[in-house]
Amino acid sequence: MINPKTTATPAGERELLIEREFAAPRELVFKAWTERDRLMQWWGPPTWPIDYCTVDLGVGGAWHYRMRGPAGEEGWGKGVYREIMPSSRLVYSDYFSDEDGTEIPPEAIAEIDFVDRGGTTLVRNKTIFASGEHREQVLGMGVVEGMSETMDRLDEHLAAVAAG
């Protein structure tokens, strides 16, 4: 189900913009996207959470993860960092992968901006796909619903951290 707090807008032929505002400081939201232990608590929809994750945060480094479905099926993903501006911006090449981290084309580029709104943080996640067909394929796989549910889990994680 898509939470109305999360907006998803196809742009141009190859882009998808997903936005969500969180009641947490920008530094904490950025850490949630870049620290392994935090990612393990929220990445993926509730029915496809990650159960394995490594993070090598640095340009040229990668995060590699496994999502596990309700019947035990698995899906692997990998992001190779291209740009890191602490607490402000992440850019990475986004791929499906295998368990060894071998990238499976086509590549998409994820540009994630963390916008300070004076006590809240807007996450602006723009994905640029290799082609319009690639975007349509990923949309057909339910990426909008999955990211909305994932953002709900991030919201819950941030609230739990704030509550101590």
Whereabouts are the PLM-identified features?
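Short, highly charged C-terminal tails/helix-capping segments
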Residues: Y52, L158-G164
